[in-house]
């Protein structure tokens, strides 16, 4: 009896060539349905349509095609079990040896902006997952393929095994099939949850399925294994970035790049540059040109900028690229790169240069592992709304101070708590990050700023529990402070600001970052 293959694919890539090899090299008989059958017949291949094979026509507008005992019995039958073989013989069912199925493109469909719920439901595949699961369950006897990428390896296996496949190969294929259906079902459940007006923003059940996108040399340290995973079939975000040159990205590179991206995404108008080290900004600046923004960000803390990660909000030009070659940098990311800039940066062959067209696209959820589970939160995408800020001091800010406070607040949002940022003329002068007490971060930021703190502004990601930070800022020459407010001792801080002639603004929004 010649081997029997069932082919029913949504993605027709390579299926005709694969089927031709099955027939010509290994003598397979083909069963197929719908568009796949049409494609194979058009290519001149001998095909039995599923409806002819089962004796049952497609019904319900194609919703029921392959859900038939003649199909599933042929797949699930155990060839080493006499009773199963007797059942096949009694019902005239032939065993099916190879199943090639990929599913309706549900995730691509729901990504379309005009997609309705009813349209999405029609893209939920029923027969396909049933075929994959049945074949994968019976991997002891059946080979199952769920992706065009598997056609080549399968043909190589058939050639090596004289028209057969090994148990190890079939088990590997079954594993891929079950992952495929699990990911598919998760996408459907997630979509239906997001479409449910009664559902809360974070569902009571959460399943995360991801595919390894790239193996990484190691994690934060050489003794830690690491890999880069992509959720779903998403092509946006970092997996959609283009690396123009440089060494492979490391785990730490990606973590720092994401931090730099999040900061620079706050600046959408004037040219802006961000330089980060260990996820904290060591220099952030705006400028009339991109090269000016970069030079100002670099000069903000040139010592820390050495070996830093740079993010730009405008396409990288030649003049800026030339300035960047003057020091050692690990990575650069920008929404574009002009040919002149690309040519200049090639002199730094190890420098990683990436193009990420949409810098604003961040993660949909933030996940942090803890013992026995993980924590999930929505990203801090609270828009900065100066119109809702409150001036609580007697001294009112000038327009120039107001704009500077906005700039400082944008940066402070992305600094590890306790976070203090000192800025003037749209450039960071001092950054106090990650200290266990707020006044400690204040002292670090003011020390970095030095004499430049005179007339500068200070932003704090959280409220001041005491007035000591306000007094330290005033002693250094700070002219205006922006903070969330909300402390039981807010009155003490306001009183200190008034006594010392400082502007104080409450945002009524906290931006802790741990």
Swiss-Prot record:
Q: What remark about domains does the record contain?
A: The IMP cyclohydrolase activity resides in the N-terminal region.
Which residue intervals define the domain MGS-like in the entry? 1-146
Keyword list, A-Z: Hydrolase, Multifunctional enzyme, Purine biosynthesis, Transferase
Example GO biological process? 'de novo' IMP biosynthetic process
Source organism of the structure: Cyanothece sp. (strain PCC 7425 / ATCC 29141)
Supply the SMART domains for this chain. AICARFT_IMPCHas, MGS
| One term under GO cellular component | cytosol
What's this protein's family per the entry?
Belongs to the PurH family.
What EC number(s) is this enzyme filed under? 2.1.2.3, 3.5.4.10
The record's listing under CDD domains reads: IMPCH
**HAMAP family found in the cross-reference section:** PurH (MF_00139)
| Catalytic reactions of this protein | (6R)-10-formyltetrahydrofolate + 5-amino-1-(5-phospho-beta-D-ribosyl)imidazole-4-carboxamide = 5-formamido-1-(5-phospho-D-ribosyl)imidazole-4-carboxamide + (6S)-5,6,7,8-tetrahydrofolate; IMP + H2O = 5-formamido-1-(5-phospho-D-ribosyl)imidazole-4-carboxamide
Under what name is this protein listed?
Answer: Bifunctional purine biosynthesis protein PurH
Q: In which pathway does it act?
A: Purine metabolism; IMP biosynthesis via de novo pathway; 5-formamido-1-(5-phospho-D-ribosyl)imidazole-4-carboxamide from 5-amino-1-(5-phospho-D-ribosyl)imidazole-4-carboxamide (10-formyl THF route): step 1/1; Purine metabolism; IMP biosynthesis via de novo pathway; IMP from 5-formamido-1-(5-phospho-D-ribosyl)imidazole-4-carboxamide: step 1/1
Q: Which GO terms describe its molecular function?
A: IMP cyclohydrolase activity; phosphoribosylaminoimidazolecarboxamide formyltransferase activity
Q: What is the lineage of its organism?
A: Bacteria, Bacillati, Cyanobacteriota, Cyanophyceae, Gomontiellales
Q: Mind telling me which InterPro entries this protein's record contains?
A: AICAR_Tfase_dup_dom_sf, Cytidine_deaminase-like, MGS-like_dom, MGS-like_dom_sf, PurH-like
């Amino acid at each position: 009896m010649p081997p029997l293959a069932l082919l029913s694919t949504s993605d027709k890539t390579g299926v005709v060539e694969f089927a031709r090899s099955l027939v010509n090299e290994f003598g397979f008989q083909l069963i197929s349905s719908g568009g796949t059958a049409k494609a194979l017949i058009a290519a001149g291949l001998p095909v039995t349509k599923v409806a002819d094979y089962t004796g049952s026509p497609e019904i319900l507008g194609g919703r029921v095609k392959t859900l038939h005992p003649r199909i599933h019995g042929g797949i699930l039958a155990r060839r080493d079990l006499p009773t199963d073989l007797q059942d096949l013989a009694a019902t005239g069912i032939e065993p099916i040896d190879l199943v090639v199925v990929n599913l309706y493109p549900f995730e691509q469909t729901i990504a379309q902006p005009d997609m309705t719920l009813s349209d999405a439901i029609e893209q939920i595949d029923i027969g396909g997952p049933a075929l994959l699961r049945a074949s994968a369950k019976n991997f002891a006897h059946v080979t199952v393929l769920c992706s065009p990428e598997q056609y080549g390896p399968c043909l190589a296996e058939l050639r090596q095994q004289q028209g057969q496949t090994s148990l190890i190969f079939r088990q590997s294929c079954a594993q891929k099939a079950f992952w495929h259906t699990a990911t598919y079902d998760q996408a459907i459940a997630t979509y239906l949850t997001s479409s449910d007006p009664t559902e809360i923003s974070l569902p009571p059940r959460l399943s995360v399925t991801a595919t390894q996108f790239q193996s990484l040399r190691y994690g934060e340290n050489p003794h830690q294994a690491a890999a880069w995973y992509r959720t779903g079939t998403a092509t946006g975000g970092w997996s959609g970035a283009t690396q123009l040159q440089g060494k492979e990205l490391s785990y730490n590179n990606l973590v720092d790049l994401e931090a730099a991206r999040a900061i620079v995404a706050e600046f959408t108008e004037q040219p802006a540059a961000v330089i980060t080290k260990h996820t904290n900004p060591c220099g952030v600046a705006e400028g009339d040109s991109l090269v000016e923004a970069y030079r100002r960000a670099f000069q903000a803390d040139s010592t820390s900028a050495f070996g830093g990660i740079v993010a730009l909000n405008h396409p990288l030009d030649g003049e800026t690229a030339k300035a960047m070659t003057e020091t050692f940098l690990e990575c650069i990311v920008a929404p574009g790169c002009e040919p002149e800039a690309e040519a200049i940066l090639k002199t730094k062959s190890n420098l990683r240069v990436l193009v990420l067209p949409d810098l604003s696209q961040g993660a949909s959820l933030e996940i942090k592992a803890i013992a026995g589970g993980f924590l999930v939160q929505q990203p801090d995408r609270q828009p900065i709304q100066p119109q809702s800020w409150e001036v609580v001091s007697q001294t009112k800010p000038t327009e120039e101070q107001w704009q500077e406070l906005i700039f400082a607040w944008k940066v402070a949002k992305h600094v590890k708590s306790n976070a203090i940022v000192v800025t003037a003329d749209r450039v960071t002068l001092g950054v106090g990050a990650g200290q266990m007490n707020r006044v400690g971060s204040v002292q670090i930021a003011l020390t970095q700023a030095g004499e430049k703190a005179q007339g500068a502004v200070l932003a704090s990601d959280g409220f001041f529990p005491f007035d000591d930070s306000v007094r330290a800022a005033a002693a250094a020459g700070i002219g205006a402070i922006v903070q969330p407010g909300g402390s039981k001792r807010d009155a003490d801080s306001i009183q200190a600001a008034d006594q010392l002639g400082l502007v104080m603004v409450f945002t009524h929004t906290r931006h802790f970052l741990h």
